[in-house]
UniProtKB/Swiss-Prot annotation:
Gene3D superfamilies: plastocyanin oxidoreductase (1.10.287.980), Single helix bin (1.20.5.510). One of its GO terms (cellular component) is plasma membrane-derived thylakoid membrane. This is Cytochrome b6-f complex subunit 4. Pfam families: Cytochrom_B_C (PF00032). It comes from Nostoc sp. (strain PCC 7120 / SAG 25.82 / UTEX 2576). GO terms for molecular function: electron transporter, transferring electrons within cytochrome b6/f complex of photosystem II activity; electron transporter, transferring electrons within the cyclic electron transport pathway of photosynthesis activity; oxidoreductase activity. The lineage of its organism: Bacteria, Bacillati, Cyanobacteriota, Cyanophyceae, Nostocales. It is a multi-pass membrane protein. The gene is petD. InterPro entries: Cyt_b/b6_C, Cyt_b/b6_C_sf, Cyt_b6/f_cplx_suIV, Cytochrome_b_C_euk/bac. Keywords: Electron transport, Membrane, Photosynthesis, Thylakoid, Transmembrane, Transmembrane helix, Transport. The 4 large subunits of the cytochrome b6-f complex are cytochrome b6, subunit IV (17 kDa polypeptide, PetD), cytochrome f and the Rieske protein, while the 4 small subunits are PetG, PetL, PetM and PetN. The complex functions as a dimer. Component of the cytochrome b6-f complex, which mediates electron transfer between photosystem II (PSII) and photosystem I (PSI), cyclic electron flow around PSI, and state transitions. PANTHER family: CYTOCHROME B. GO terms for biological process: photosynthetic electron transport chain. SUPFAM superfamilies: a domain/subunit of cytochrome bc1 complex (Ubiquinol-cytochrome c reductase).
Length: 160
């Protein structure tokens, strides 16, 4: 059963408003030719113009050339792998580090089974899922920031 209100097109007032371009078009507008011929090309050209403008105004820096005979003191991964790198770097046993990384998805799989409430509720009324999300976000940020620091300062973030 539909709950959408259908417009009464026999109403002369509504027809006059629609003829003037006023009011909402509840009954829809066909995609051909309006969107495909007019809207989509403008969006595509605008996106292309933004990309070209960004490439011209802010070209990518190439950096210094690589020297195969000089190894850096500490090799760091890309920024999005910092938390995983910090787990592997701070735990003494490699197997323990791999198990710690594997336990993260397993813990996330268990969250819906721990919290037995309606899944369509407000997220702030689901305390377990909200707490797990906030704790996981804080731990990920802590690990990511700590990975960029030297090993002796990484766990305390250099604060203590």
């Amino acid at each position: 059963m539909a709950t959408h209100k259908k417009p009464d097109l026999s109403d002369p007032t509504l027809r006059a408003k629609l003829a003037k371009g006023m009011g909402h078009n509840y009954y829809g507008e066909p995609a051909w030719p309006n969107d495909l011929l007019y809207v989509f090309p403008i969006v595509i050209m605008g996106s292309f113009a933004c990309i070209v403008a960004l490439a011209v105004l802010d070209p990518a820096m190439t950096g210094e050339p690589a020297n195969p005979f000089a190894t850096p003191l500490e090799i760091l991964p890309e920024w999005y792998l910092y938390p995983v790198f910090q787990i592997l770097r701070s735990l003494p046993n490699k197997l323990l580090g791999v198990l710690a990384m594997a336990s993260v998805p397993l813990g996330l799989i268990l969250v819906p089974f721990i919290e037995n409430v309606n899944k369509f509720q407000n997220p702030f009324r689901r305390p377990v899922a909200t707490t797990v999300f906030l704790f996981g976000t804080l731990v990920t940020l802590w690990l990511g920031i700590g990975a960029a620091l030297p090993l002796d300062k990484s766990l305390t973030l250099g604060l203590f």
